[in-house]
Amino acid sequence: MANRNDSRNNRRNKDDIEDQLVAVNRITKVVKGGRRMRFAALVVVGDKKGRVGFGTGKAQEVPEAIRKAVEDGKKKMINVPKVGTTIPHEVIGHYGSGNILLKPAEAGSGVAAGGAVRIVMDMAGISDVTSKSLGSNTPINVVRATIDGLKKLRTSEEVNKLRQPERA
């Protein structure tokens, strides 16, 4: 049963970018004639080789909301620097009142993270990391804070280049 569920939530496209559903919310708009139901989907996309992004989509049907979220996620992909199977250094990502602390871990230790952070790390291809979620725990805030933390990562070469003034 786990395999069937994985294949449903994790699809592979021809451009080698996978997507994984994080959350689906039912949204209700109250109008004169009653309630109008819509769905909002949060999807994380990535190639498991250092590129990751997230997207949101809203529609009257769940599959259409997921499709819109995947398109949105592909537009907003970022490159994540990696050192082997982990991240180069410790970092804190912020979004709203949600904070995510990401720490590098030794090879083979795995991803010690909650649901939404684990999905982002899996889609980015990071297999060894430790994280702590602080503040808001809603999936959208956690995903945005995690992506913010990944944007802040720098390799040692990038840091050295910034520290060294160019010589004329």
Curated annotation (Swiss-Prot):
What domain comment accompanies this record?
Answer: The N-terminal domain interacts with the head of the 30S subunit; the C-terminal domain interacts with the body and contacts protein S4. The interaction surface between S4 and S5 is involved in control of translational fidelity.
Q: What keywords are assigned to this protein? A: Ribonucleoprotein, Ribosomal protein, RNA-binding, rRNA-binding
User: What residues does the S5 DRBM domain cover?
Assistant: 17-80
Concerning Gene3D superfamilies, the annotation shows: 3.30.160.20, 3.30.230.10
- What family does this belong to? Belongs to the universal ribosomal protein uS5 family.
One Gene Ontology term of the biological-process aspect is: translation
Q: Which SUPFAM superfamilies match?
A: dsRNA-binding domain-like, Ribosomal protein S5 domain 2-like
Native species of this protein?
Lactobacillus helveticus (strain DPC 4571)
As for what it does, the entry says: With S4 and S12 plays an important role in translational accuracy. Located at the back of the 30S subunit body where it stabilizes the conformation of the head with respect to the body.
Matching Pfam families: Ribosomal_S5 (PF00333), Ribosomal_S5_C (PF03719)
Q: Which HAMAP family does the record cross-reference, listed alphabetically? A: Ribosomal_uS5_B (MF_01307_B)
Molecular functions (GO terms): rRNA binding; structural constituent of ribosome
Q: Which domain of life is it from?
A: Bacteria
User: Could you describe the subunit structure of this protein?
Assistant: Part of the 30S ribosomal subunit. Contacts proteins S4 and S8.
Q: Which GO terms describe its cellular component?
A: small ribosomal subunit
Q: Which InterPro entries match?
A: Ribosomal_Su5_D2-typ_SF (IPR020568), Ribosomal_uS5 (IPR000851), Ribosomal_uS5_bac-type (IPR005712), Ribosomal_uS5_C (IPR005324), Ribosomal_uS5_N (IPR013810), Ribosomal_uS5_N_CS (IPR018192), Ribsml_uS5_D2-typ_fold_subgr (IPR014721)
The name under which this protein is listed is Small ribosomal subunit protein uS5
